[in-house]
From Swiss-Prot:
This protein's name: Immunoglobulin heavy variable 3-11
Subunit structure comment from the entry: Immunoglobulins are composed of two identical heavy chains and two identical light chains; disulfide-linked.
GO CC term (a single one): plasma membrane
Function: V region of the variable domain of immunoglobulin heavy chains that participates in the antigen recognition. Immunoglobulins, also known as antibodies, are membrane-bound or secreted glycoproteins produced by B lymphocytes. In the recognition phase of humoral immunity, the membrane-bound immunoglobulins serve as receptors which, upon binding of a specific antigen, trigger the clonal expansion and differentiation of B lymphocytes into immunoglobulins-secreting plasma cells.
Signal peptide bounds: 1-19
Protein's gene: IGHV3-11
Disulfide bonds: 41-115
Region (Complementarity-determining-2): 70-77
Major subcellular site: secreted
Region annotation Complementarity-determining-3: where it falls in the sequence: 116-117
Location within or outside the cell: Secreted; Cell membrane
Keyword Disulfide bond assigned: yes
Lineage: Eukaryota, Metazoa, Chordata, Craniata, Vertebrata
SUPFAM superfamilies given in the database record: Immunoglobulin
């Protein structure tokens, strides 16, 4: 019985910590092929400047696809081949914010975009 109570207590602690981290995306919309959009992600509940950050996406009926990541100091970025040369990831550590500038958009870029720590 003691083990069961300890397990429930541990789960509650872990869930409580996870719930403090918040990432809120904005900036999506409808755009014609060839157009541009800028996504933003407002982070809270952790020291944003300590973490690499990523953008991932999920196209309708498909799995998650990694798009890009950026180092904590912005000194290093990397992109999926499918978006290289068209998308630019950036961040503002003073504002706890992550961005994704998307240019030359294509039909295949249609997806739900998420920022991730």
């Amino acid at each position: 019985m003691e083990f069961g109570l300890s397990w429930v207590f541990l789960v509650a602690i872990i869930k409580g910590v996870q719930c403090q981290v918040q990432l809120v995306e904005s900036g999506g919309g409808l755009v014609k092929p060839g157009g541009s959009l800028r996504l933003s992600c407002a982070a809270s509940g952790f020291t944003f400047s300590d973490y690499y950050m990523s953008w991932i996406r999920q196209a309708p009926g498909k799995g998650l696809e990694w798009v890009s990541y950026i180092s904590s100091s912005s000194s290093y970025t990397n992109y999926a081949d499918s978006v290289k040369g068209r998308f630019t990831i950036s961040r503002d550590n003073a504002k706890n914010s992550l961005y994704l500038q998307m240019n030359s958009l294509r039909a295949e870029d249609t997806a739900v975009y998420y920022c991730a720590r």
